[in-house]
Amino acid sequence: MNGGHIQLIIGPMFSGKSTELIRRVRRYQIAQYKCVTIKYSNDNRYGTGLWTHDKNNFEALEATKLCDVLEAITDFSVIGIDEGQFFPDIVEFCERMANEGKIVIVAALDGTFQRKPFNNILDLIPLSEMVVKLTAVCMKCFKEASFSKRLGAETKIEIIGGIDMYQSVCRKCYIDS
């Protein structure tokens, strides 16, 4: 085996996916791996780079398709991808990079605000060596939260926002509201 593999970090909004992605990439940096992170360029909530909801910042390339950054990442051995659910080529890209010996770490929502699979992100599960599903805290009853609930009536899937537009909720609070 060439050492390449895929690590998938999934969960609802506010579960710490981006924070965990940054932690893992930093861990490889400490071990002297050449690392790069990629963020979805339409996510400009906090400015350039990769941002967590608690305003931690990490340098990142920006793209709407991962194939657009292939040339820029050839010299890196660890690739971190934030908001993986928004990249239409996430599955093919991750499989190709892992097969080329690269470590690929993806942070992504597993479900939409309607609790449906988010694009093709779940197709990465059988291709991943490691899958972690994080939970958040329900913003209504403070129990474990596995779901993202959108505030408002907008039905479009790709609406990028933070605490102003979404809540993490448990099953009961999702159903009750």
Curated annotation (Swiss-Prot):
Coiled coil: none
EC number, as in UniProt: 2.7.1.21
Catalytic activity: thymidine + ATP = dTMP + ADP + H(+)
Keyword Metal-binding set for record: yes
Pfam families: TK
SUPFAM superfamilies given in the database record: Glucocorticoid receptor-like (DNA-binding domain) (SSF57716), P-loop containing nucleoside triphosphate hydrolases (SSF52540)
Residues annotated for substrate binding in this entry: 113, 157-161
Name of the protein in question: Thymidine kinase
Gene it is expressed from: OPG101
